[in-house]
């Protein structure tokens, strides 16, 4: 277990062969060193015990049962004291079985194997540091064109049998046939080690011979020369120069990183392969006799099996054809590639059911990988998740929480309230009351929620407004309701987005939520300072629909000439008249008018609104016998007396606009009252 006080950070880097051995090797009290896995077997088919030196060997990874060795002998294990005693017959330590979760093993490869991440992943680090085409290195690693393609690099201070140097390509293969007949297998291995190299061995030789300082200096000088070259008129040539400069920058960064971290480039070629602990790649036998196993076990078995075959070819067979050895090395390379990143070279390695094996890369990468699923992000208690819908009736700092979700999130608080009020005798009774959904539990839940904020989070949390605090309100249904103005901070909309709910438990967390994280205190963008709680498209469309009027307006009666009355302003008699807001809202409730139908409202607040429209010509002017005139305009009408003084003013509006205006007035009035109250408090404090 990693303790945060001792290990403040975690860094992933290349491991040397010695480091991999140190992870796995252990020295027993009798002096024997264990840790190397040499057999591809797992469990014995009769005894169901792990095979010795296999992938589940108890001697290497620890006992399956705590304090019991492979022979069945037992010894008590004291957790406060480490026991180095072990069984002299089977060599298994008397220790806790939990060591099988972190004890590793290793496989000593019969030939160097190139790490596929550093060869095939883009950018290819091996190709960059060697300054060679990736296709050329692939042909060399996998022996696709051997013996036509190999690396000729004689060993220093030794006589040369062939005067070759560099990457050689021969169409005439007669010489290689003569050499393979002249040398035995061991003799050819000695010759090959001195004169030619293929596969991962060739890559390792080139990486080991690199002088990183010289690589950095030469790349820097070339980049400096290219930077001084002025732009040509040839676009193709300019692009070629730019690509070369980008390559040199990557090469300088890579060599500089190797120098600063004391990592050797040849570590990108594997000589020792680590084996995961058995508990991380389990094998389970079902009651019917079937076995469920991790894909890692099958991939490790293929590597060990092919590695042992190559060892036999090199050690036991005196006249094995050299081409067979090259082919076996290629099989080992492909098996290790499948373990690390299956399918990276095209066709993945498959099992008997034609299903691709799940490699190490698939286990750790992606949203459901080990890092993002288990290490960087974990499921936590007192949290929930649901779809968000709009809640226009909510205040800015409120959110609607479904009853089903709220009773689960605040269950412990409700249980404490039930027991504290003597409505339940113990924990079991309280849970039964909650399970039966008694009516009075909702009242207790509301009291609990009233003083307890919740945190809403929408992934991805790209800035601090991605998680904000709200006052929960109980609602029906199963969706979380959210005020539309806070969607800007979350970058959310109501087309199926989901949000997570978290309950802050400690007093410090609740205080921080109330003081710093409440939505009504986060109205400005932390990046730009611009308002972020602004109406979104949904709100703008809603306001547009609320305040729209029918397309005909005051001219609607022109299409109904038979409905005119004897009113003095008969041309516009179909449009109703109202003296105040209350009459309009009452008519709306009685469905005598709808939201969009035009109506005349007597305006008594400010008659100066017509000053800007004095130049507008009236549509119609009507006179009464008493001398009173009616001047009808497109959006208002004026009633004047004999002395041309304004007796009354009516404006053309709709019920929707009246509702909108009333809400705006109430909001402004409440803001002014709150501001005045706050100023009075500050004044009282200063006095």
Curated annotation (Swiss-Prot):
Catalytic activity as recorded in UniProt: RNA(n) + a ribonucleoside 5'-triphosphate = RNA(n+1) + diphosphate
Enzyme Commission number(s) of this protein: 2.7.7.6
The protein's enzyme class: transferase
SUPFAM superfamilies: beta and beta-prime subunits of DNA dependent RNA-polymerase (SSF64484)
Pfam families: RNA_pol_Rpb1_1, RNA_pol_Rpb1_2, RNA_pol_Rpb1_3
GO cellular component: chloroplast; DNA-directed RNA polymerase complex; mitochondrion
Main location (coarse class): plastid
Required cofactor(s): Mg(2+); Zn(2+)
Gene Ontology biological-process entries: DNA-templated transcription
Cofactor note: Binds 1 Mg(2+) ion per subunit. Binds 1 Zn(2+) ion per subunit.
Subcellular location: Plastid, Chloroplast
Keywords assigned by UniProt, alphabetized: Chloroplast, DNA-directed RNA polymerase, Magnesium, Metal-binding, Nucleotidyltransferase, Plastid, Transcription, Transferase, Zinc
Molecular-function GO term, any one: magnesium ion binding
UniProt key word Magnesium: yes
Residues the record lists as binding Zn(2+): 69, 71, 87, 90
Subunit description: In plastids the minimal PEP RNA polymerase catalytic core is composed of four subunits: alpha, beta, beta', and beta''. When a (nuclear-encoded) sigma factor is associated with the core the holoenzyme is formed, which can initiate transcription.
Protein name stated in the entry: DNA-directed RNA polymerase subunit beta'
